[in-house]
């Protein structure tokens, strides 16, 4: 028994702002028939575009088992002919009724019924099929096709329009099976001259009505004009009414569907971003959706301590969060263990797979996702790689409220175009740059974007993992990397992956050039990840000092301002002590040119720990700008021959004799706390009889070097005092 056709109630409801025309009697004689056995995301996109233009739609076969074959192969589709033949019985005698039969999963309307009917009647045929460049499924039939002087030669079965009686004639001879080829059936009718003339069939050779994308990707561009957007065929200079992402072109349809119909324009921005939201407003913490966060540390990663701090600071109740951690790197085991020990009880649950478990990337990602899939209480799975710097504490709530099956927040490398999504794929499935990629990354176009590839950070609905994505192994796929395999498998299930750049979320660390040979490797990241280096190591009040605030002058022409965080001070001291090769404090010093030091200290030079380039970058980026403000008219390139950390101890070297520095100006940064780590110490400028006896940790003194500022280091009486010194522009 053939199921009855299903008429969905939404199709007749008028929408505000629709572009479909006035609802004339002519348009009332238009009916759109489509086949959809399941309400996929592709179908819902088709439905929305039909709603927008106020088309009258009848859906055939809804909830019926699909037996029409694999849609990835050209053969099959006979089930659609059977359903159409059955539906046409009730319309056979309606001579004025025009019926459009169209696919739904990979189709968009770009214009309304008025334009469609006008172009159909201009064709002066009773039935018009879409046309394309390729013949299938039987290439031997090519010679039988009528020659075409201008346009596409071959019939495409994905869309056709005609009068009801003529369409009844078209399908009345169908007696095939559900998995027989509808394409071959219609092709043979068209190639029979008698039937073609009797039914009065023509092809839409110039894509005036139907734009099949297969074999025509280079022909189609977006046309923005007067707050509207259309697909334009450059080859024929036409504006098709219907866009069909047939064959391997579904990804291009996804791209076009980010704009058509009026989804996004330059004048309006995103018009659908607030549709179908899931509001979390007013929901008590204990009633919020449960999230499983999968954390993946797959390679040595800088700033991991900051990563865990940001994780803890996410604005979401920890008792509604479970955490799964896969740490592949022994280098990070101590940091992971510390986080688990200190914070595991704060969360609903926590599971860790470490280096000793020898679980590889793809398998670990499958395990994390499977924990959510198998837990009926898991509402969302949030995958988060350790190189993602997630600064927006509202990220989880934002993604949940957007209410998509799969959604990723945009993150990119600092001031780079490298990001966590691709706007297009090359023919072999790798990266290709879409026309809008740069605008999306730089947020010149803001909205929700259906994209073919996401990575690093994304959210998946738990119910989707238990339905469309219930396959337990999503992260393997031949020779593909785990992230590419995941996206490939998600796309194959017809699930859309969205990217949102409606908010600033954060960025991605560069893992290139990350060294693991030091005690505190993050210190060396000033080149690769300057923004994160600044956040960790530069004092929070440095910007105020740069504006002239928080700058003190305790002695004439001696400036005092914040520069380092406590972490920077501690790690620099610990790095020097870890290196351990302190100088002896003698005048003889092979480290300097000439081998003689007039005013020796017990110290370690920056170049001894391989930190000279990084220190120069620090001086150039942070000391030079403030120098030029404090000493107007002087412009420094922060050249230096000596940069070092000095250690003062009562039983070692407690003080330093009066001297001039071999510099134009000097910086002297206090690296620990007077009264806590040591007693005494400080600096006295003899010419001014002015002393600074309580240096503040992380603050620097800046003063002229040779000629005017003759000074001495005051005795350290207890503990150990550390300072970082640079003689600049010697």
Curated annotation (Swiss-Prot):
Top EC class, one word: oxidoreductase
Membrane topology reported for the UniProt record: Peripheral membrane protein
Signal peptide limits: 1-20
The entry's keywords: Dioxygenase, Endoplasmic reticulum, Glycoprotein, Iron, Membrane, Metal-binding, Oxidoreductase, Signal, Vitamin C
Location(s) in or outside the cell: Rough endoplasmic reticulum membrane
Coiled-coil ranges (or none): none
Residues bearing carbohydrate: 200, 403, 541, 689
Any one cellular-component term (Gene Ontology): extracellular space
Single Gene Ontology MF annotation: L-ascorbic acid binding
A Pfam family that the UniProt record links to this protein: OGFOD2-like
UniProt: Fe cation binding residues: 659, 661, 711
Assembly description: Homodimer.
Name of the molecule in the record: Procollagen-lysine,2-oxoglutarate 5-dioxygenase 1
Originating organism: Gallus gallus
Encoding gene (name): PLOD1
